[in-house]
């Protein structure tokens, strides 16, 4: 049986439909075959008709595969027809493992847009050996969470003249006059993640997938309060810790660098840049409110049933409008600190940090446009740039899998760009 280059699973969902639309519109995918997959053939056909109307490219007769995360046989049949499965069905802690299992067992690589560290790391624990034996790649967090951040640190390491010691990143989501609301599916994933945090046993998983002790630089990251003022000469504002998957993904990439590439690992911290302290306090209170109420079944059900009201309309069942997405964008700032001197990996620097570098990553709407561009770039890399991937299959982070590839060019074609802004001695 011949395989499609890409199968988009969950193509009738809110995010999945955008992934298919940007695939159809991308010149990078010309000459590649694709299919859409999901539970309802009717909904999938409707998505294809809508995309045909929006793009002016007739894909109404594109291949459709009916598959369901609760039906192992259908997932196996889907995976047997794919070179790469793009999995856009979340929450992944509920529906993701069956798709990974089917892909690995049937010789398909798998990328997804999960931002759920516990699930992501459990997939490495359970499937990395089998994926390596099959020669396929499983790469999670290939959406906006966490390609911009993980590949941003990788970009900084490659462009730092000397030995990089630590990085602080700041991300800001920019909205237009129409405002912005994320789709409620992201909110439901957040609720599940908070409620499952106590039982995830993530520490034990990490000891298994990262058994070796790696040595990072002697200079530690600055200790920051939960809410603090940014006072870089290139950036000001207020910062709070970033609650997403970026830090966990980057730390796994640093482990891979140290143990597999013999590249010096760095210390890392991730933050959100806010325009005011008042907004920071509101976000903090909301997260505290969620963290308390997810513990109790009754209040958790209320949170799940009323995402609009319980998130103060930051999340909506309807998701953002087309205008809101068109007006939205994001920017990452990566501040790197290190030494202009280069030492062997097993030697530590002495003395003060003496070099600083700033890089940025900019792109369109983070939630859906950039996420589509990121996961499609990951799929393209698996298809077109195999020579620059790790030699063996397995479960990898984005930087571990794609750090030496052409993915930066693919990302740029979707409007996601990296720039070295400055580098100077301290």
Swiss-Prot record:
Protein location: Membrane; Lipid droplet
GO cellular component: lipid droplet; membrane
InterPro entries the record matches: NAD(P)-bd_dom_sf, Saccharopine_DH-like_oxidrdct, Sacchrp_dh_NADP-bd
Residues of the signal peptide: none
Transmembrane listed as a keyword: yes
BP terms from Gene Ontology: glycolipid biosynthetic process
Membrane topology note: Single-pass membrane protein
Transmembrane segments: 278-298
Keywords, comma-separated and alphabetical: Lipid droplet, Membrane, Transmembrane, Transmembrane helix
Domain of life: Eukaryota
UniProt record similarity statement: Belongs to the saccharopine dehydrogenase family.
Official protein name in the record: Lipid droplet localized protein
Species the sequence originates in: Caenorhabditis elegans
């Amino acid at each position: 049986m011949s395989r499609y280059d890409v199968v988009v699973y969950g193509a009738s969902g809110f995010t999945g439909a955008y992934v298919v639309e940007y695939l159809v519109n991308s010149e990078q995918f010309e000459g590649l075959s694709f299919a859409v997959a999901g539970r309802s053939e009717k909904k999938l056909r409707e998505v294809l008709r809508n995309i045909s109307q929006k793009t002016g490219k007739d894909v109404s007769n594109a291949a459709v595969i009916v598959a369901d995360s609760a039906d192992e046989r259908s997932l196996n049949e889907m995976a047997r027809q794919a070179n790469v499965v793009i999995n856009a069905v979340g929450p992944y802690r509920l529906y993701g493992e069956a798709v990974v299992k089917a892909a690995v067992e049937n010789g398909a690589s798998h990328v997804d847009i999960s931002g759920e560290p516990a699930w992501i790391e459990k997939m490495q624990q359970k499937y990395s050996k089998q994926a390596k034996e099959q020669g396929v790649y499983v790469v999670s967090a290939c959406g906006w969470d966490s390609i911009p951040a993980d590949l941003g640190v990788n970009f900084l390491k490659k462009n730092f003249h000397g030995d990089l010691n630590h990085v602080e990143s700041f991300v800001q989501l920019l909205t237009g006059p129409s405002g912005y609301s994320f789709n409620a599916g992201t909110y439901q994933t957040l609720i599940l993640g908070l409620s499952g945090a106590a039982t995830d046993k993530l520490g034990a998983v990490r000891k298994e997938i990262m058994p070796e002790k790696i040595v990072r630089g002697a200079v530690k990251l600055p200790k920051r309060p939960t809410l603090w003022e940014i006072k870089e000469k290139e950036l000001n504002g207020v910062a709070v810790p970033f609650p997403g998957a970026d830090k966990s993904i980057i730390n796994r990439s640093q482990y891979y660098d140290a143990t597999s590439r013999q590249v010096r690992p760095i210390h890392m911290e991730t933050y959100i840049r806010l325009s005011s302290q008042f907004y920071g306090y509101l976000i903090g209170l909301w997260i505290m409110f969620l963290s308390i109420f997810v513990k109790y079944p009754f209040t958790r059900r209320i949170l799940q049933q009323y995402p609009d009201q319980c998130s103060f309309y930051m999340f909506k069942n309807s998701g953002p409008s087309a205008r809101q997405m068109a007006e939205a964008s994001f920017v990452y700032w990566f501040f790197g600190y290190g030494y202009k001197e280069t030492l062997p990996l097993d030697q530590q620097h002495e003395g003060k940090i003496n070099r600083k570098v700033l890089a940025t990553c900019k792109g369109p709407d983070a939630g859906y446009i950039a996420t589509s561009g990121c996961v499609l770039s990951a799929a393209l890399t698996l298809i077109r740039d195999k020579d620059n991937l790790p030699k063996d299959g397995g479960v990898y982070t984005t930087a571990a899998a794609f750090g030496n590839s052409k993915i930066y060019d693919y990302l740029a074609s979707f409007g996601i760009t990296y720039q070295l802004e400055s580098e100077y001695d301290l």
